[in-house]
Amino acid sequence: MKVAVLGAAGGIGQALALLLKTQLPSGSELSLYDIAPVTPGVAVDLSHIPTAVKIKGFSGEDATPALEGADVVLISAGVARKPGMDRSDLFNVNAGIVKNLVQQVSKTCPKACIGIITNPVNTTVAIAAEVLKKAGVYDKNKLFGVTTLDIIRSNTFVAELKGKQPGEVEVPVIGGHSGVTILPLLSQVPGVSFTEQEVADLTKRIQNAGTEVVEAKAGGGSATLSMGQAAARFGLSLVRALQGEQGVVECAYVEGDGQYARFFSQPLLLGKNGVEERKSIGTLSAFEQNALEGMLDTLKKDIALGEEFVNK
């Protein structure tokens, strides 16, 4: 199993690479790519960690050597948020980066599963889909927007509020991956009940958690370490499913049946070919139903922006 991380010299990429080096199954290969010249050195640094995961680093304009034979490609390349910016302010720079990298993936490892981490995910996933479609290699079961950070934040905040062990809580999060499009389904957390006020406050905190980190870092970056952990969790789940493990479920932002929007984050059963089944979002509370209806315009606009970027 070969995993490639594109954008591996950045804050998310380095954290993700460290976690994959220590947690990928024995015998896996990990390849790191970034435009930054430091990247081969990041790989050398990580290569000193005693795990049976082979690692190589590549830098420069061409990601091809890193992508050859990759089964999973995780893309975290791009610029980070600064205070006062929201994820959509990143669009102008990051759209071009994602387009370029996905074009390279389409040529070198068209059958790989691709996880897009680069924000704004609502839009960058649509860009990736259109690029793959133009290249004639798009498989909607193999393209994912990584929204796992919303899930781990939800798990953490719910556990804190309710005095639970964080590892015991699993909150499904649907919709998209920015602002109002992030919808934690708090009504579906087993064995926990919330007041209306708690639901309103928690939902807002989960939606704004990225901004909380950006402000706390005082201009020195955005959520890189927790995002690295979230991306590793998703990447490792994908690897386990590709290797034949049964019953692996993760939420991610994928193209589905278009019931709500062309791309939508929902629980997915993962399998040997990527998405095996798009699971139902279940029964929503009145609050959640309202929030779902209220986000769809924003989500659809985000998606259209990505489609137009490639097709203009």
Swiss-Prot record:
Q: Which residues bind NAD(+)?
A: G7, A8, A9, G10, G11, I12, G13, D34, N94, I117, T118, N119, M227
* Oxidoreductase keyword on record: yes
Pfam name, any one:
Ldh_1_N
**EC number annotated for this UniProt entry:** 1.1.1.37
Q: Which Gene3D superfamilies match?
A: Lactate dehydrogenase/glycoside hydrolase, family 4, C-terminal (3.90.110.10), NAD(P)-binding Rossmann-like Domain (3.40.50.720)
One Gene Ontology term of the biological-process aspect is:
malate metabolic process
Q: Which residues form the active site?
A: H177
- One GO molecular function term? L-malate dehydrogenase (NAD+) activity
**Where, in this chain's numbering, is substrate bound?**
R81, R87, N119, R153
Q: Which UniProt keywords apply?
A: NAD, Oxidoreductase, Tricarboxylic acid cycle
Q: Which reaction does it catalyse?
A: (S)-malate + NAD(+) = oxaloacetate + NADH + H(+)
Highest taxon in the source lineage:
Bacteria
Extract one GO cellular component term from the record. Answer: cytoplasm
Family membership, please give it.
Answer: Belongs to the LDH/MDH superfamily. MDH type 1 family.
Outline what the protein does: Catalyzes the reversible oxidation of malate to oxaloacetate.
Subunit annotation: Homodimer.
State what protein this is by name: Malate dehydrogenase
Species source reads Escherichia coli (strain SE11)
Name the lineage.
Answer: Bacteria, Pseudomonadati, Pseudomonadota, Gammaproteobacteria, Enterobacterales
Gene that encodes the chain = mdh
